[in-house]
A protein has these predicted regions:
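Channel- or pocket-lining gating/hinge segments that regulate access to a cavity or pore
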Residues: 190-296, 314, 318-327
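Intrinsically disordered, low-complexity peripheral segments of secretory-pathway and membrane proteins
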Residues: 29-69, 261-355
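Juxtamembrane amphipathic/hinge helix adjacent to a transmembrane helix
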Residues: 185-192, 243, 303-312
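N-terminal secretory signal peptides that target proteins for export/translocation
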Residues: 1-12
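Soluble non-transmembrane domains of integral membrane proteins
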Residues: 30-194
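Sec-dependent signal peptide recognition
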Residues: 12-18
Length: 355
């Protein structure tokens, strides 16, 4: 029985160690919170075909843990890893008066975001940086947004109007958890800016050539039906010109498998030009019929001559009436169709798009 006291001491030590472990590893521990901010300095080389752009920005991080989150940082939408410049401002993170750590990164590189081009050329696009931690999930690390994030006041992007900055944080679930058991989520932050294409791109660059071609088509209604070659030739030339304009204006767009707003305007132009060609053919046939009736008048007897003259007057009246109505209604129908296409594509917000 001499060994009993030693046995009790060993058991007591084990109990104390177990209690210490329970205190050191509490269940449901809170994830580390890292404050992230961004200051967008420049956006350039926007490539619609590749859904890419070049961004220069300053990122800063504040945290209280021992691990440096900038070491495991990953840009989710990085396009060219070899061209990424990610330079820390300080060799070692600073220690702030409140005990938290601080590091700042100068970031420059080429990134991507899938552009929504359905309303081109009245579209708006997001230019963003997306970043997350590669080693710790949302149960271990959560990014918090710094409210002082923004863009440089003098930021200018040729061909675009700079709108509101983008500052977002969201949880992204990883399907399959990369082969691990359980659910895997990452805290992801987005920094960027919203760019709006101004109205002048459509109304001063693209629509004027289209309207000029349609106006040339409209002039055929002022030509007499006897000039059939000029009427039909003008319409066919206008149709070919519209085709070339569409190819030129949409050359920088990637293949989408669907039509954009500009394509719909061109499709309306094709319909109107085809209708004008149909009108020219109809008028030409009526004019030929009138010419035939006029040639037969001399050989007809008096009773038949009166009937033929009445028919001739009716045919000539139809020709003049058809041209007159076409002169009046074709411009109205085309302009109204363009307005409806633009309105249905952007809705009431089209009136708030900057010039």
């Amino acid at each position: 029985m001499a060994g009993a006291p030693g046995l009790g001491s060993a058991f007591a030590v084990r109990v104390w160690l177990l209690l210490l472990l329970c205190v050191a590893m509490p269940a449901g521990a809170e994830p580390e919170r890292v404050t992230v901010g961004s200051y967008l300095r420049n956006v350039e080389a926007i490539d619609l075909d590749q859904n890419a752009y070049h961004v220069s920005a300053v990122l800063w991080f504040k945290w209280k843990g021992e691990r440096d989150p900038t070491k495991s940082l990953r840009f989710v939408n990085l396009l060219e890893a070899w061209a990424l410049t990610q330079v820390p401002v300080y060799e070692e993170p600073l220690t702030l008066p409140d005990g938290s750590r601080y590091q700042r990164l100068l970031v420059e590189g080429r990134f991507f975001h899938k552009f929504a081009l359905g309303t081109f050329p009245l579209d708006w696009q997001k230019v963003m940086l997306e970043l997350e931690d590669t080693q710790r999930g949302a149960e271990q690390l959560v990014f918090e947004l710094d409210p002082s994030s923004g863009v440089v006041p003098e930021l200018s992007v040729p061909g675009w109007v700079v709108k509101a900055p983008i500052v977002e944080e969201k949880r992204v679930e990883v399907p399959g958890s990369f082969g691990l058991a359980g659910k895997l989520e990452h805290s992801r932050v987005r920094f960027g800016v919203l760019l709006q294409r101004p109205l002048r791109v459509l109304f001063t660059t693209m629509l004027p050539p289209i309207l000029l071609v349609l106006m040339c088509c409209w002039f055929v209604f002022f030509l007499k039906p006897v000039h059939v070659e000029a009427r039909v030739g003008t319409v066919i030339t206008a149709l070919l010109t519209i085709v070339f304009l569409q190819l030129a204006f949409t050359d920088d767009l990637p293949y989408l498998g669907s039509t954009v707003l500009l394509d719909q305007l061109f499709n309306l132009s094709y319909v109107v030009i085809t209708a004008i060609l149909f009108e020219c053919v109809t008028v030409t046939r009526l004019f030929d019929k009138a010419q035939t009736l006029e040639a037969k008048l001399a050989a007809l007897v008096e009773t038949e001559k009166v009937k033929a003259e009445a028919e001739l007057v009716m045919v000539r009246g139809r020709v003049e009436s058809l041209d007159a109505r076409s002169r009046r209604w074709f411009p109205v129908v085309y302009l109204l169709g363009c307005a409806l296409i633009i309105f249905f594509a952007r809705g009431p917000e089209v009136f708030s798009i900057p010039l």
